[in-house]
């Protein structure tokens, strides 16, 4: 079954409002084994909406439309669908009843403009809106079934779940395909390298698809398939997952789509370990990442942004002589920072960073992009020194934080 999604509204078309509806609908359809071919957006124009509906219905099995069902003059979707289907608008008893019930339950008066929402294309099936005024509807146009829903996200989600998907599943009948997917997370490789290593995917795994997306500095690889039965789909997804791990290598750290901070948290829980962080160049970003994971209070104990040298001395017990001799950005300093924060917090591990995020502050010996990382644990302190610059302060800080988290992750393996 081939599906397309059509969003209507000037605000969506102009980018004033982000179209989160399309993303949600696509995820639900994919989970049901339905292939989503296109997302389309048009403004509040009767002719444009009608033309888009006509065009899409010529190539799709189902069309899901959002927006334009309200009582105002710019709510044109119902009329546009009727025009595309060459149907007249008629008062739908079910739509009228659901609207009256909505207003009575809330002790509100139904306005004359609201009655417009009960007018549906002739032959349409009303889809009741349990939490709003505007009913949705389903209308067959040749081989394509059109489902029209409100643009308000919570109303759309409710209608999609209770009124639209059950009808689509009925349309699928015995021809339903079952979807399975896995998402693998990568850190430490550029996107181009990951793409090169994925080059043989299609030949090695017929019937599987993959997609790559980047959320700097992580890369997510999603493998997916649609098969006649769920067991086959899941087995193929598992095989694809193993293939990706082998081809991409140890830079793959999760096959459950976890972000690095979540994977570190999982490993800390598994090890019954705790962590404390002393940050200089990352400015609290590591702590923010770790505490953004639900349940992080089980393993995250303490964070200190010891930006000034004196703070490193006063809070962490770093020797002034160490800073004077080696500088704040040095393996010697982060060694004492990591050891100090571990001691102060009583944590299993102490993690520390000090570096030069830029755009200024670099020297020939320590250019912008230099970061030193220290990790103190039960078996001592390890340090590392890396120089990787993206000539962007925010990106450098984020990269430094992930390098530190990766250091901890590898220690926990």
Curated annotation (Swiss-Prot):
Signal peptide boundaries: none
Record SUPFAM superfamilies: CinA-like, Molybdenum cofactor biosynthesis proteins
CDD domains: cinA (cd00885)
Classification via InterPro entries: CinA, CinA-like_C, CinA_C, CinA_KH, Competence-induced_CinA, MoaB/Mog-like_dom_sf, MoaB/Mog_dom
Pfam families, alphabetized: CinA, CinA_KH, MoCF_biosynth
Family of the protein in this entry: Belongs to the CinA family.
Family annotation (NCBIfam families): cinA_nterm (TIGR00200), molyb_syn (TIGR00177), PncC_domain (TIGR00199), PRK00549.1 (NF001813)
Name recorded for this polypeptide: CinA-like protein
Species assigned in the record: Desulfosudis oleivorans (strain DSM 6200 / JCM 39069 / Hxd3) (Desulfococcus oleovorans)
């Amino acid at each position: 079954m081939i599906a397309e999604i059509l969003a209507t509204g000037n605000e969506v078309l102009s980018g004033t409002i982000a179209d989160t509806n399309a993303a949600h609908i696509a995820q639900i359809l994919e989970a049901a084994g339905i292939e989503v071919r296109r997302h389309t957006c048009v403004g509040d124009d009767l002719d444009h909406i009608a033309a888009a509906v006509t065009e899409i219905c010529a190539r799709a099995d189902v069309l899901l439309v959002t927006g334009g069902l309200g009582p105002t003059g710019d709510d044109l979707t119902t009329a546009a669908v009727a025009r595309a289907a060459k149907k007249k608008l008629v008062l739908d008893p079910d739509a009228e009843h659901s609207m009256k019930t909505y207003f009575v339950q809330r002790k509100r008066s139904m306005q004359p403009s609201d009655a417009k929402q009960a007018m549906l294309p002739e032959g349409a099936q009303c889809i009741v809106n349990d939490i709003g005024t505007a009913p949705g509807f389903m209308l067959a146009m040749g081989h394509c079934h059109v489902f029209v829903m409100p643009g308000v996200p919570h109303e759309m989600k409710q209608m999609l779940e209770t009124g639209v998907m059950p009808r689509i599943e009925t349309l699928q009948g015995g021809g339903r395909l079952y979807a399975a997917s896995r998402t693998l997370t990568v850190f430490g490789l550029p996107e181009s390298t990951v793409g090169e290593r994925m080059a043989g995917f299609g030949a090695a795994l017929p019937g599987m698809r993959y997609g790559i997306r980047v959320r700097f500095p992580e890369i997510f690889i999603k493998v997916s398939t649609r098969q006649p039965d769920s067991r086959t789909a899941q087995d193929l997804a598992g095989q694809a997952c193993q293939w990706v791990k082998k081809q991409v290598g140890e830079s793959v750290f999760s096959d459950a789509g976890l972000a690095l901070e979540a994977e570190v948290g999982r490993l800390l829980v598994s090890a019954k370990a705790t962590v404390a962080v002393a940050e200089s160049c990352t400015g609290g970003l590591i702590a923010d990442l770790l505490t953004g994971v639900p349940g992080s209070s089980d393993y995250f104990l303490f964070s200190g942004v010891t930006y000034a040298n004196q703070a490193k001395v006063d809070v962490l017990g770093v020797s002034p002589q160490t800073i004077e001799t080696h500088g704040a950005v040095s393996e010697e300093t982060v060694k004492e920072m990591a050891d100090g924060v571990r001691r102060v917090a009583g944590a299993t591990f102490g993690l520390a960073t000090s570096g030069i995020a830029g755009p200024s502050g670099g020297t020939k010996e320590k250019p912008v992009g230099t970061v030193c990382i220290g990790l103190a644990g039960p078996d001592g302190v390890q340090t590392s020194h890396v120089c990787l610059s993206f000539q962007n302060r925010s990106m450098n800080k984020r990269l430094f934080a992930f390098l530190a988290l990766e250091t901890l992750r590898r220690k926990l393996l």
